[in-house]
């Protein structure tokens, strides 16, 4: 079953799903803006198209992740994103 999600007044939209090859995940798109997300469990983020400028928990420097890049976010934490162009992503819940 698919689950639609919308955040930040519609600037971030995702569709949640579960599959045998991916596990529980969501795929989505973010438009330009700055966002802060909280995690309940560890997440693996893959940038599909575009780029994300990311400040991970306990980090002091922002890091750019472009299409094909992967980064991990610990559970029960918060991370910050800067998005300069519409960017698509896959988020796997680990």
Curated annotation (Swiss-Prot):
This protein's record includes keyword Glycosyltransferase: yes
Gene3D superfamilies from the UniProt entry: Jelly Rolls
SUPFAM superfamilies: RmlC-like cupins
Pfam families attached to this UniProt entry: Ppnp
Keyword Glycosyltransferase appears in the UniProt entry: yes
Record keywords: Glycosyltransferase, Transferase
GO molecular function annotation: guanosine phosphorylase activity; purine-nucleoside phosphorylase activity; thymidine phosphorylase activity; uridine phosphorylase activity
InterPro entries: Ppnp, RmlC-like_jellyroll, RmlC_Cupin_sf
Catalysed reactions, semicolon-separated: a purine D-ribonucleoside + phosphate = a purine nucleobase + alpha-D-ribose 1-phosphate; adenosine + phosphate = alpha-D-ribose 1-phosphate + adenine; cytidine + phosphate = cytosine + alpha-D-ribose 1-phosphate; guanosine + phosphate = alpha-D-ribose 1-phosphate + guanine
Gene Ontology CC: cytosol
Family recorded in the similarity comment: Belongs to the nucleoside phosphorylase PpnP family.
NCBIfam families hit by this protein: PRK10579.1
Summary of the function given for this chain in its UniProt record: Catalyzes the phosphorolysis of diverse nucleosides, yielding D-ribose 1-phosphate and the respective free bases. Can use uridine, adenosine, guanosine, cytidine, thymidine, inosine and xanthosine as substrates. Also catalyzes the reverse reactions.
Protein's recorded name: Pyrimidine/purine nucleoside phosphorylase
Protein encoded by which gene: ppnP
């Amino acid at each position: 079953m698919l689950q639609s999600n919308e955040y930040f007044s519609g600037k971030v939209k995702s569709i949640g799903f579960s599959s045998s090859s991916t596990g529980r995940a969501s795929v989505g798109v973010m438009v330009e803006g700055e966002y802060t997300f909280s995690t309940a469990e560890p997440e693996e983020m893959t940038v599909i198209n575009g780029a994300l400028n990311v400040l991970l928990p306990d980090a002091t420097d922002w890091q750019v992740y472009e299409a094909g890049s992967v980064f991990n976010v610990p559970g029960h934490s918060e991370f910050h994103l800067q998005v300069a162009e519409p960017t698509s992503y896959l988020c796997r819940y680990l």
